Amino acid sequence: MNRTTLILFFIILSNTITVIHGYVRGCYYTNWAQYRDGEGKFLPGNIPNGLCTHILYAFAKVDELGDSKPFEWNDEDTEWSKGMYSAVTKLRETNPGLKVLLSYGGYNFGSAIFTGIAKSAQKTERFIKSAIAFLRKNNFDGFDLDWEYPVGVAEEHAKLVEAMKTAFVEEAKTSGKQRLLLTAAVSAGKGTIDGSYNVESLGKNFDLLFLMSYDLHGSWEKNVDLHGKLHPTKGEVSGIGIFNTEFAADYWASKGMPKEKIIIGIPMYAQGWTLDNPSETAIGAAASRPSSASKTNPAGGTASYWEICKYLKEGGKETVHQEGVGAYMVKGDQWYGYDNEETIRIKMKWLKEKGYGGAFIWALDFDDFTGKSCGKGPYPLLNAISSELEGESENPEITTEEPSITETEAYETDETEETSETEAYDTDETEETSETEATTYDTDETEGQECPERDGLFPHPTDCHLFIQCANNIAYVMQCPATTFFNDAIKVCDHMTNAPDTCI
């Protein structure tokens, strides 16, 4: 398709019109960012107008029976106030064409409940019916599945997704409404991809695939690296040649996912380390500890982009890595890897050349959303994405025309009540801010390890906090994040509350 030609296809399906638009610009909104103090506090009113084609509201949850539930006390409307669901979906009134999806799950939610649903026909049916009712009740345009990860249950996962798509189509026919969109956030790790996804089946049923091409490196490793880099780099120690955006996207495409459905993930935050030797700063430099606490992550190890801008003003030195396409900043013994405007523009040009469907960000509250930290106006990173992708139509994405919505009141921001469930979730978020790749990596101990099978994830023989990722019979010893262990039954790094007594 010629880049200068705008083609509109009108498909009559279920009494609705489906229109093909340009590149996707997806934006995750996190419902726990409301609890940050001061300049980090983020509410629906902070969401920009016109920069996102899709807003993904993170997160909702589901119980063991399969029933949909809100995560926060103020997600839904009450008799006395409008909730954050309404505040976010209301943005469509001033942004025609915007789609707002509800994202279910997330890293902290885990895999067990989704697995139980997928393995039970009765629970699957209940889950789908509940989800449709919940989405319609709260005026969402679709469902985003953030199941991290369906390792070992790829076929059950695929059948669940197929059943959801079928039900969404049938519901649109009977209701006369536009079909609910069905999307997913998925792993960029080869081992997880191989063990979790029937890609050919998913390619037929997902409307969009949000590739979490970040957190490929982090402070769980003992060497610094760019966690969302585009290409492999010299000096990389773990995931050599495969822990990069290009490999992950191309691998999904090679396994049968249509390129126009693959949406490239761009982090709005940095992964950080404390250098062992501040004079050694190149990729691969030794760093045995996470970076210091930040305002967005008191546990350390990450920092938002707006915090990076402040560190730069305080004397940090930024280097753009041309080979890998990523940036890093060094300030004393603190090392942070991230994307800036320059590297994002390179990534956008790359994805257009490769034929991918667009980009998405994790997350809105990590960009300089106030414009006060970087001195470049609000949302410098998201604006870089939007300016490169807006108006393009090389790889269109299919959505349906806007439904009618009921007039709602403005979101009320003076609520102060907070439940114990919210407090627990917010604490979890400080441990893992990116809601993405559950497995994390350390390849210092690969020597001498053998692969039981050509590809897959396997327990470490002596340490429950490690596991072995095999790719083409090459063994990589990986390390789970702090306070987790490798659960071989579900093939993920799981919370220690589920660990056997022998795992200390």
UniProtKB/Swiss-Prot annotation:
Keyword Protease (UniProt): no
GO cellular component terms listed in the entry, alphabetical order: extracellular region
Keyword vocabulary terms for this entry: Calcium, Carbohydrate metabolism, Chitin degradation, Chitin-binding, Disulfide bond, Glycoprotein, Glycosidase, Hydrolase, Polysaccharide degradation, Repeat, Signal
BP-aspect Gene Ontology terms: chitin catabolic process; polysaccharide catabolic process
Reported function: Microfilarial chitinase, which may function to degrade chitin-containing structures in the micro-filaria or in its mosquito vector during parasite development and transmission.
Family under the similarity heading: Belongs to the glycosyl hydrolase 18 family. Chitinase class II subfamily.
Protein name: Endochitinase
Organism: Brugia malayi (Filarial nematode worm)
